[in-house]
A protein has these predicted regions:
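Conserved class I S-adenosyl-L-methionine
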Residues: 1-42, 55-59, 76, 141-172
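Core SAM-dependent methyltransferase catalytic element
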Residues: 199-201, 222-229, 234-252
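A short glycine-rich, Lys/Arg-flanked "PGG" loop and its adjoining helix->strand segment in the class I
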Residues: 126-141
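Short alpha-helix
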Residues: 182-206
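A short acidic, Gly/Pro-enriched loop at the edge of an enzyme's catalytic core
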Residues: 99, 103-111
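A short SAM/SAH-binding and catalytic strip from SAM-dependent methyltransferases
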Residues: 110-125
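Class I SAM-dependent methyltransferase SAM/SAH-binding core
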Residues: 45-100
């Protein structure tokens, strides 16, 4: 997690509200898809991979699911553990790569989910999808939302619309922050959906939706923002979908 992102998460304090207001934890059509395909989450087993700020984990725990939160970052998990204790949420925190899920049993999970910012850190999406397929119960769902791949090629500015790179250029891209080097990926739709299908999962629903105005300003989940940025005449990128949401099922 970048220092800017961490600062915003600390300032907005929305993690305290997620258990009672799960809509704060999900963008795109993720929460409606969870409700449509998974129904009442009480007593069901949910696994959040690449859990990051753990908003989704807190929300699912508030929905009375038995939640396992998995992330590669020990620091992220420790922050989330302290917050979960404060909120009196029962969540299992596991440090693991998303492409191994080594402590999660086969055929044991009703819902796997991942949220915004997950796939930029994933070098082999197909390896992740195979693990998701393995841990899901037959009939279980993997539901994810992330920034739509169509947003990745552009420079981070409202106007003029300028490309920063070709859509086909997926990385790895080197990032350096506070002396730490990391690598990110900008996967295309085909890079995500083809290996998802190859894993054996079946896509039941796909949504490509717009974002709130705040999306075009900063990383905050807070409401409000400059509504003019939702007009593609002022901000051409807003004419493209901002979020990709997918619901995929492991066959019965």
């Amino acid at each position: 997690m970048s220092s800017d992102w961490q600062k915003l998460r600390d300032e907005d304090g929305l993690w305290r509200l997620c258990p009672a207001q799960p809509e704060l934890a999900f963008e795109g059509e993720a929460l409606p898809m969870i409700r449509r395909y998974c129904g009442d989450m009480r007593g069901k087993r949910a696994c959040v991979i690449g859990s990051g700020d753990n908003y989704a984990a807190f929300a699912l725990a508030g929905m009375e699911a038995h939640v396992t939160s998995i992330d590669i970052s020990a620091r992220q998990l420790e922050i989330a553990r302290v917050r979960a204790d404060e909120l009196r949420l029962q969540i299992s925190f596991v440090q693991s790569d998303a492409d191994s899920l080594h402590l999660v049993e086969d055929n044991s999970i009703d819902l796997v989910c991942s949220t915004n910012g997950f796939f930029v850190w994933i070098a082999e999406p197909g390896a992740v999808f195979k693990q998701v397929y393995r841990v899901l119960k037959p009939g279980g769902f993997y539901i994810f939302y992330d920034v739509h791949p169509f947003q990745r090629p552009w420079k981070d500015q409202a106007a003029p619309l300028e490309m920063a790179k070709p859509y086909s250029e997926t990385g790895p891209f080197e990032q350096v922050e506070a002396g730490q080097v990391s690598f990110e990926f900008n996967w295309r739709l085909s890079d995500l959906l083809n290996p998802l299908l190859d894993s054996g999962l079946v896509i039941r629903r796909l949504a490509e939706t717009q974002a709130k105005a705040r999306f075009w300003q900063d990383f905050s989940y807070e409401p409000s923002g400059d509504e003019r940025l939702l007009d593609w005449h002022n901000n051409p990128r807003s004419g493209l979908p901002a979020w990709l949401t997918v619901a995929a099922q492991k066959p019965e």
